[in-house]
UniProtKB/Swiss-Prot annotation:
Highest taxon in the source lineage: Eukaryota
Name recorded for this polypeptide: Serpentine receptor class XA 10
Xref: PANTHER family: SERPENTINE RECEPTOR CLASS XA 10, SERPENTINE RECEPTOR, CLASS XA-RELATED
Main location: membrane
């Protein structure tokens, strides 16, 4: 039986719309939940960066991919000519921001593996500083082509980003398009190495070799109170898992981009409805990585989020902790 591409396109669009609304709500409420949380062990700065950029990505995605679907060709042309290039910059910026933040998270993990003292270089204020650096670089790489004659403008009717000086493109656009696809793969590779290192730490031989390289640098942490050291290691493990899942998820998405780049006829031979269906299904998975990482794979943030939604959104009383009553028993002995 032949599959109707138009029906598949409508299903794909519905899936993308549903994922967009759900993840916009989740990212906003997650940010509020983390802000009101008293858990100081959370990597809050990374969570804010991922959640806020993801919420903005959803908003720009609605403007670029969803609203034009319901417009007439004439209305869409006016819409695209007026703000199309601007919102194309917005959607690209917020798509690249989690990738760059992932690179920072990976560097953080590697630095702590090399030396626990490196955690001093990744305090909350310093992470905000580092993210502001890559945000500035990201914005510069997008605004320079935008101000040139080769600015990029997404066209939903052609299902692609179109250069206004086509077939040419700005050198920065060409460079970023070629290399940005490898960001999640590189991060995934190094996060796998970090996980291997984490598993090898159970080996006494590996620990001895590692301590030889850290000789003279471990006094600060061996003298730490055990509860502080335990909390620090718990935070590091949480970050490792989050970085790995994020890298894996984004790598899966970028893998399809790499395949389409190597074999472009796979996409080019599809009908317009087929191209839109494929695009909407791909887009639907992009905003889900925050929910996947911080709700599915991170029990701590999941509990914080559920408590926040229960109390602040549904105005329910906080869940009571179960207490076990111990009754005192007396024994009598016969004399």
């Amino acid at each position: 039986m032949d599959v109707d591409a138009a029906v598949v396109k409508r299903i794909a669009l519905w899936v993308y719309e549903t994922c967009s609304v759900f993840n916009l709500f989740y990212c906003i409420t997650l940010s509020l939940a983390i802000k009101t949380s008293k858990n100081n062990a959370l990597p809050a700065t990374y969570i804010y960066n991922m959640a806020i950029s993801n919420a903005l990505l959803v908003i720009f995605g609605i403007m670029v991919y969803i609203l034009p679907y319901y417009m007439s060709d004439k209305t869409y042309k006016t819409y695209r000519d007026s703000i199309g290039a601007m919102i194309s910059v917005g959607v690209t910026f917020n798509y690249l921001h989690p990738m760059l933040t992932l690179i920072l998270m990976t560097i953080n993990r590697i630095a702590v593996v090399v030396s626990m003292q490196a955690s001093q270089l990744f305090t909350s204020s310093k992470i905000w500083l580092y993210t502001s650096f890559h945000m500035t670089a990201n914005f510069a790489c997008l605004i320079i082509p935008y101000l040139s004659e080769c600015r990029i403008n997404y066209d939903i009717r052609k299902v692609g980003f179109i250069s206004e000086c086509a077939p040419d493109r700005h050198q920065i656009t060409t460079f970023s398009n070629y290399y940005s696809v490898f960001f999640p793969f590189v991060a995934f590779f190094f996060n796998v190495l970090v996980i291997i290192n984490f598993k090898l730490q159970r080996s006494p031989t590996y620990t001895k070799i590692k301590n030889m390289f850290r000789r003279g640098n471990g006094d600060q942490f061996t003298s730490m109170p055990s509860d502080v050291l335990k909390a620090k290691k718990k935070t590091e493990r949480m970050l490792m898992i989050q970085a790995f899942i994020t890298a894996f998820y984004l790598s899966v998405y970028e893998l399809t981009s790499l395949v389409l780049r190597v074999v472009p006829e796979l996409f080019g031979n599809l009908s317009l409805d087929g191209k839109l269906a494929f695009t909407y299904f791909r887009l639907a998975q992009v905003p889900c990585h925050v929910f996947l990482v911080y709700f599915i794979f991170t029990p701590v943030t999941r509990k914080i989020y559920m408590d926040f939604v229960r109390e602040r959104v549904f105005c329910m009383k906080p869940a009571k902790k179960k207490t076990i009553k111990v009754s005192a028993t007396t024994t009598s002995t016969k004399k």
